[in-house]
A protein has these predicted regions:
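Short, well-structured beta-strand/strand-turn elements
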Residues: 34-44
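Catalytic core segments in nucleotide and nucleic-acid processing enzymes
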Residues: 43-170
Length: 170
């Protein structure tokens, strides 16, 4: 392989993950500004995901990671969520992401239904991949599974769709 080709391949990865980290950091900032009585924990940039068993010791799946946990003023968990920057790739990435989200939502809601906490699941997604009509349709179907407990937003939708009343509703 010519040096130029190798350099081009390596250059593509120099900022790998940066857009996702920027998105996560901005979400944390917006959340803190919009909901000063609530708290949000998790890695704002690079860092280990939060395993749900560390929040809920009786959570049945020891390998269920989340990107953040939102807590009310008393410290009780009220929401968990995921932040993803979707590139412009569709295909397998698209199917894996949304299919995994559906399974995850079902698992978390099933667990929480027995405990009656009213836990919400928030999916923060952004990036040009959302322009793929099928990807956005899949996200809309995900939210439609239980709009009282599931929310899919972009940063532009944050102020319009993510409300404290919804977060705190049991």
């Amino acid at each position: 392989m010519p040096d130029e080709a190798l350099c081009a391949v390596l250059w593509e990865y120099k900022d790998r993950g940066k857009k996702g980290y920027d998105l996560t950091e901005r979400f944390f900032e917006m959340f803190a500004s919009a909901f000063p009585k609530l708290s949000l924990e998790g890695p704002k940039r690079a860092g280990s995901d939060i395993q749900l068993q560390t929040i809920f010791p009786d959570y049945p799946n020891p390998n269920r990671p989340v990107d953040f946990v939102a807590r009310d003023a008393s410290g009780e968990p009220i929401a968990v969520g995921f932040v993803r920057y979707d590139s412009d790739r569709g295909g397998a990435q698209e199917d894996d992401r949304t299919g995994g989200y559906v399974n995850c939502a079902k698992e978390i809601l099933e667990y929480d239904t027995l405990r009656r906490r009213g836990l919400k699941v928030i999916y923060v997604n952004d990036g040009p991949g959302l322009l793929l009509g099928s990807m956005w349709d899949d996200y809309a179907k995900l939210e439609a599974m239980n709009p009282n407990r599931l929310l899919v937003i972009t940063l532009r939708m944050f102020n319009e769709r993510l409300k404290e009343k919804w977060l705190l509703k049991k």
